[in-house]
Amino acid sequence: MITKAEIRGFKRFAHERFAIAPLTVLAGLNGSGKTSLLQSVMIAAEASKTRSVAISLNGPFGLELGTAEDVLNWETRSPIEIAFEATTGTATWQLTVPSEEALYLEIAERPVDLPKAFSGTPRAFTYLSAERLGPRGFSAASPLPEAELEVGVKGEFCAHVLSVLGDRLIESVDRSHPLYAPAPPRLLKYEVEQWLSEIARPIEITGERASGATVAELRFRAPGSAWVRSTNMGFGITYALPIILAGLIAEKGGLLVVENPEAHLHPAGQSRMGVFLAWL
């Protein structure tokens, strides 16, 4: 597990250290550096999996950082350094700027030993953007194999993930809802339904993908009623679903990063979302 972060020369951070707990909440005034910290995490995640000597500032995880000049700290012109301390040791990335107009950073130094979150293990690192997809009639199917399926940065693959994994037992008994633990693991979709029902209202969910199709579909229903498309559901449910699903399939010991988990939820639902994230 990651316990500390240290950032040098990146955006507003000349040199800052941060403590990381099993549940870490970033709060503060606008422009105080919350997003910059998250962006440094995503840069490290991308740098850990690329075989290139450079990392793009625009594209990975939906990043739109602009040019190298935009990410350099204005107080220091030293190389950007991003480090994470974990129970397995410290991993450090040093990134240099080829030119101020460059749309990438060069990876001058990368760690040999990586925290699990950056190890490339499927579902060990998940980032969910604040701009998650609202209700859609259909959404794209993921191009990844079953063992590597993820919900996507905007939750765009939730329907596909549920169509493949929904009727399977959750992989860890630790992910069984507290009401049912320590009973044997249940189907993933039942766990998703349990948490969504607490956050929003009693609800059932299914993901469907026709054989050979490149799209998948979510359907919902209140217990005992007819199935409806996600376009007939509120934003709160479709905004909360990627968080619940990603959390339940996340690799133990990894890192789940969620921006604005409370978005489009009633205050009572926001409270229950906090309970879910703390329980993970």
What is each residue range found by the language model?
Residues 15-21, 247-252, 279:
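Phosphate-binding P-loop
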Residues 10-12, 25, 32, 132-135, ...:
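Short, solvent-exposed loop/turn segments at secondary-structure junctions
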